[in-house]
């Protein structure tokens, strides 16, 4: 299985960098990246679960993930970290840059993909919806702290509840995001300037709340 499509991102919104992307990984030929090697922008790849076959819409087999990483290397793309992503949005110097993001902090990421990323020091952002941390199927705070100690890793805000926040009132949205922010500060010692919308869904109002948070 190879990577079929990528979506470039070049938008920056004040205090929070908003990542609300949906990426599709579909079987294709190895040459499937050749049509984007000259594209301008930063490619962001989003993953969720690894080797959790009962969740096909958000799952990827670890063997396919390894193939995708190898494919990225084959075409000489550069993996960038959160800091470089932010600076490159302000001053786009070149193409062929890729940022990996992982949503939800599922336990399967820690068990399946983390060893590979750690061994190869591939940078990524792990977006955490903090209410679920430590519950069944999710990572623990201890595991997240372990990961966050690596310089190539950044832990981002993915809300507290992972609810459909676009349906909530302003005060509910603010409370939810603030709870996640407080959890991150308490457990990791910092507040992230990166936010990933739950389900990739947002509204103008929601975006403005994040913008001014």
Question: Model segments located where?
Answer:
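Positively charged n-region of N-terminal signal peptides that target proteins for export
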Residues: 11-15
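Bacterial N-terminal signal peptides
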Residues: 18-24
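N-terminal pre-catalytic segment of deacetylase/amide-hydrolase enzymes
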Residues: 26-98
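Metal-dependent polysaccharide deacetylase catalytic core of the NodB/CE4 family, i.e.
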Residues: 40-55, 95-98, 107-205
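Noncatalytic alpha-helical scaffolds and linker/capping helices
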Residues: 103-105
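Short, intrinsically disordered, charge-balanced linker/junction segments flanking boundaries
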Residues: 207-213
């Amino acid at each position: 299985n190879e990577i079929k499509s990528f979506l470039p991102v070049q938008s920056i919104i004040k205090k929070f960098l908003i990542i609300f992307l949906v990426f599709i990984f579909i079987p294709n030929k190895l040459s499937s990246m050749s049509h984007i090697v000259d594209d301008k922008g930063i490619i962001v790849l989003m993953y969720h679960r690894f080797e959790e076959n009962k969740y096909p819409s958000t799952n990827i087999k670890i063997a396919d993930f390894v193939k995708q990483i190898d494919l990225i290397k084959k075409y000489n793309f550069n993996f960038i970290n959160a800091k470089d992503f932010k600076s490159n949005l302000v001053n786009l110097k070149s193409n062929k840059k890729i940022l990996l993001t992982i949503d939800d902090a599922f336990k399967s990421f820690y068990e399946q993909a983390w060893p590979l990323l750690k061994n190869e020091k591939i940078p990524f952002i792990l977006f955490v919806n903090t209410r679920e941390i430590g519950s069944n199927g999710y990572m623990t705070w201890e595991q997240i702290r372990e990961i966050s100690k690596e310089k190539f890793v950044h832990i981002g805000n993915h809300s507290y509840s992972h609810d459909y926040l676009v349906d909530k009132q302003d005060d509910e949205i603010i409370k939810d995001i603030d709870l996640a922010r407080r959890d991150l500060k308490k457990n990791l010692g910092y507040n992230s300037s990166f936010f990933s919308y739950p389900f990739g869904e947002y509204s103008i109002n929601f975006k403005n709340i994040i913008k001014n948070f």
